[in-house]
A protein has these predicted regions:
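ATP-dependent adenylation/nucleotidyltransferase module used to activate substrates
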Residues: 2-179, 242, 260-275, 279-283, ...
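Intrinsically disordered, low-complexity coil segments
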Residues: 12-18, 59-60, 220-231, 237-240
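A short, flexible beta-alpha/helix-coil linker loop
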Residues: 98, 198-200, 249-250
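Generic alpha-helical secondary structure
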Residues: 119, 207-215, 251, 255-259
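Short, flexible, solvent-exposed loop/turn segments with mixed acidic/basic and small polar residues
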Residues: 149-152, 232-236
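Mid-to-C-terminal catalytic subdomains of enzymes
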Residues: 164-231, 277
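A short interface-forming secondary-structure element
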Residues: 236-257
Length: 287
């Protein structure tokens, strides 16, 4: 999917105060009316949910999270906690995007097929509960990105994107989260487990489970060796092995000995092939 032209999105509110940005977002949410927020527990959807509860009241808002093998168990637990903090009802929808052969093929547009399945399920929930709209945490930077196939599914289903619609960038989202004192205001982005699998490597339930085990093993090892980590990914590269990506501070703190032990711990989790470490780069295996 090509990036949307800047002319199709409103001016950024990046330089507004948090209070001004909040006023604009709340006004937009009031115009949308009762809705379901497609929720992940991350900062983007949490800001939309927090704003919706403030603008419409908890009785007019529902949060929904798609639960499938691509969702790490820690992320599901986090989403339950955050929804509870915001006073919103959270509905867990079991989805089976992995049953779609186009999703499993992982040919570069996997996110489209995933979002189509997930958002169709959320739209069905909205209809059953008598809520007029579904909203996502898509922000202006997402719309400007070069490769966001999932946005096509959202457009096809007429899902609203209140953050992007008011011109909120990721920086503004963080500012709003701090303004509302959300517990996830500094939470790193945590996309689905399938995002760790290189394009062309089939996405299966077993491979998704392997990614989750590998990241838990890697995180545990680094904690044991007192290496603070903000961003951690274990990328599966098919015949090329795997790559562990860490934020720069963590990468700098990893000694030669710790590096060897980390790669061995990941191999013990069942990941085979040549392993390497690199600086974390968001979307380095975009699909």
């Amino acid at each position: 999917m090509q990036a949307r032209s800047d002319s199709t999105v409103p001016p950024s509110v990046e330089f507004w105060s948090a209070r001004s940005a909040a006023t604009v977002l709340l006004a937009r949410l009031r115009r949308v009316g009762p809705l379901v927020v497609a929720f992940s527990g991350g900062v983007d959807s949490a800001v939309v949910l927090a704003g919706a509860v403030r603008a419409l009241g908890a009785d007019s808002v529902l949060a929904a999270i798609a639960d499938s093998p691509s969702l790490a168990r820690t992320e599901l637990s986090n989403a339950r906690r955050v929804a509870g903090e915001l006073g919103a009802e959270l509905v867990v929808l079991r989805t089976d995007e992995h049953a779609d052969p186009d999703y499993r093929a992982n040919a570069g547009d996997r996110c489209y097929f995933c979002k189509r399945t997930v958002l169709t399920a959320v739209c069905g929930l909205a209809q059953r509960r008598g809520l007029a709209k579904v909203a996502t945490g898509t922000h202006l930077d997402d719309r400007r990105a070069a490769h966001r196939p999932g946005l096509r599914a959202a457009a096809e289903l007429a899902v609203c994107e209140p953050l992007a619609e008011v011109g909120a960038t990721k920086q503004v989202v963080r500012r709003l989260a701090a303004h509302w004192d959300l517990s996830v205001r500094d939470k790193p982005s945590m996309p689905c487990l399938a995002s760790r699998i290189a394009v062309g490597v089939p996405v299966t339930v077993n491979v998704l489970g392997l990614v989750e085990r590998a990241e838990l093993a890697a995180g545990g090892y680094l904690t044991e060796h007192r290496v603070p980590v903000r961003d951690l990914r274990v990328r599966l590269l098919g015949d090329e092995g795997f790559r562990v990506e860490l934020d720069q501070a963590a990468l700098d703190a990893v000694s030669v000995q710790t590096r060897a032990g980390l790669l061995a711990r990941i191999a013990d989790a069942g990941v085979y092939g040549q392993g390497d470490l690199a600086r974390y780069h968001s979307g380095s295996l975009s699909g």
